[in-house]
Each structure stands twice: as C-alpha cells, then as structure tokens.
A protein has these predicted regions:
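Short, charged surface segments at domain edges that flank catalytic/cofactor-binding sites
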Residues: 1-37, 59-65, 156, 165, ...
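Catalytic cores of transferase enzymes with a strong primary signal for eukaryotic protein kinases
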Residues: 2, 36-38, 46, 71, ...
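Histidine-centered nuclease catalytic patch
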Residues: 19, 40-73, 81-101
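DNA major-groove recognition helix of helix-turn-helix/homeodomain DNA-binding modules
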Residues: 77
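Domain-level detector of nuclease and nuclease-like folds
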Residues: 82-172
Length: 223
C-alpha cells in the first residue's frame, strides 16, 4: 500500500439529489488522487476500474456515497476484498501504510512462490493485521481459474519493475568503472523515484532497499 492525500472537497456528483459514486467526476478525481493505482496492490493503469468502499456500505447510503470511503481499485482486489474484510488501513490518513506492512515479491512466478506480506516497522494494530490478511489474499490467492490468471499477471508486472531495481542495484554496487558523484547520484535518484507514491508497487521497492544492507547504506532511508 501507499499513502496519498485526499482533498477535503468532494466531487459534485456526491452532493446532488441523484448521487452517483461512479460518475466521471468521482472516478477522475480518485484516479488523480491514487495516481491511477489500485490502493491495495499498487498496480497502475489497469483498464477495468472499480470504485471500492473501504468500509463495506451494505446498503447504507451514508457509507455508499461518503467521499472518504471511496477508493480506486482493480477488479482482482475489489472482488477479493468484497464485503468480508473490514477495519482496513486508510491510506489517506496520517499513518505511513508502506511502513506498516512489509512486502517482498518472489523471483519465480508460480503458485508455490508467495509474496511475503508481514508486519513492518510500526506497532501492530487491528487495522494493520486486518490489512495484512487482505493483502496476502490480494497478492497470493489462486482459488479460482480466473484468480490464477490474474495473480500470474500481477506477479509478472511486479517482477518487471523488480528487474529494473536489480539492474540499478547492480550498476550502483558493481560498476564497470568507478562512479563519479553525478552518475552515482543519478542511480540513487532512480531508486528513490521507484519509492515515490506515484510509482507502481512502490512499497515493494522501499522494503527491497531497506532490507538490503549494501543498498540501504548508499541510498539511505526511503520511508
């Protein structure tokens, strides 16, 4: 997960007599706020967008059209979360959700190699534990044929950027010739860009750098 800032003013479609949380102004505003990324898995630029209710509305019109309860999500994460997962971290609040939950992607893409989802640097809480359980399902669940396909595609996307990080790491730690300050600074900046909230799967790269003794010494704190 990644932290974002939600503006207090909400789209007009949520204040009219015929409220619509799927109206274009709502969807476009959420797309901008969340950098076109799923608020759970951090996939970016997916074609099938769902407007997710972090707190399931269960027919409650107040929750259904509450601006602060609407989140940008992919089909996979939205269907897995459903109405059963509650007490989920709100990435629009002050808590650094990327620090709360540690994530690591496997190097091999099959059902037997799981994404590691565990408690990060913050003290545990009901919300953190609930979100860990949900994210573990989002990244690893393959209980239907469609979820096997969507999970494989998701991991492939993560691994694409993971390869970029490993390439930068190699060039930074094992250069062909000694690095001067400018190219070294450029490589470090490339890694920091990957840790920005607008970058796909940014929480993975924060933890990859943080847990790498050599890389973290060069790059510094990325949280």
């Amino acid at each position: 997960m990644f932290s974002v800032i939600r503006p207090p003013t909400f789209p007009k479609s949520l204040s009219t007599s015929t409220k619509d949380y799927r109206a274009s102004d709502v969807v476009e505003e959420l797309q901008d706020i969340f950098f076109a990324k799923c608020y759970l898995c951090e996939r970016q630029g997916f074609p099938d967008v769902n407007i997710e209710h972090r707190d399931p509305h269960l027919g409650d019109s107040t929750k259904k059209f509450d601006w602060h309860n609407l989140f940008y999500a992919c089909v996979r994460c939205n269907s897995i979360k459903g109405d059963t997962h509650i007490n989920i971290l709100d990435c629009c609040q002050s808590i650094d959700v990327s620090q709360a939950i540690e994530l690591h992607c496997p190097a091999i893409n099959n059902e037997n190699h799981k994404v590691i989802v565990k408690l990060g640097n913050l003290p545990t809480s009901l919300e953190i534990e609930s979100t860990i359980q949900l994210l573990d399902r989002c990244f690893n669940e393959t209980n239907t044929s469609l979820r096997k396909i969507s999970r494989h595609s998701l991991i492939r996307d993560i691994q694409k950027y993971q390869k970029q990080l490993l390439n930068i790491r190699f060039n930074l730690l094992y250069p062909k010739r000694p690095l001067t300050q400018i190219p070294k600074h450029e490589l470090v900046n490339e890694l920091k860009v990957m840790c920005s909230p607008d970058f796909p799967f940014s929480a993975f790269w924060k933890w990859a750098i943080t847990r790498d003794a050599d890389l973290s010494r060069v790059v510094g704190n990325v949280f």
